[in-house]
Amino acid sequence: MELNGTLPGCHLVSAFSQNKDELILEFNDGRKSTFIKASLPPELTCLSFPESFARARKNSVDLFSPLLLTKVSAVETITQDRSLIIRFDDDRALWFKMHGNRSNILLLDKQRPVDLFRKQLTEDLTREPTAFARTIDWSETGFRQNEGNWKKYYVTLNAPVWNYLEQEGWSEANVDQKWKLFRHVLELLQNPNFFI
């Protein structure tokens, strides 16, 4: 779903949770609703976009109520990060920080976190989305310039990627061989095969 073409101009009409690691958001443009279901369990964090959603009458809690009926002004991604920001007309925003077991949704007021979906991640109250924006050079030159610091430089690659590289002989490889392995992994990530 192309959120930047869908959500601007819509109002947030409900934000609630029925499960510990799940947030449902409903946006409406006066004609139809658009739903975002944010699932944040550590084993698989993802966003899905159901066509409709029936809210349970029990075990449901309203969240981010200060944003209700506020109009969306923009949707943006943070460069080289697994994050999405939904901006509202009143200088507030919802930041979807999709970082594996550290995933969270933060209510921002003037770029500063003021409320959290996963309250136990209190360090998120000190974070700013601009600190996560970065330009990463994926070229061979960038790779060689960051020799020995690859895990810190290529922050968007998580543990399974580095584990795969290790299984393919990363530790024993020289820099040229590592570059070939790295390039191969990038190709796999950009053109994935998956089965349902």
Regions found by a protein language model. Name each.
Residues T6-P8, Q18, P66-L69:
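Flexible, charged surface loops at secondary-structure boundaries
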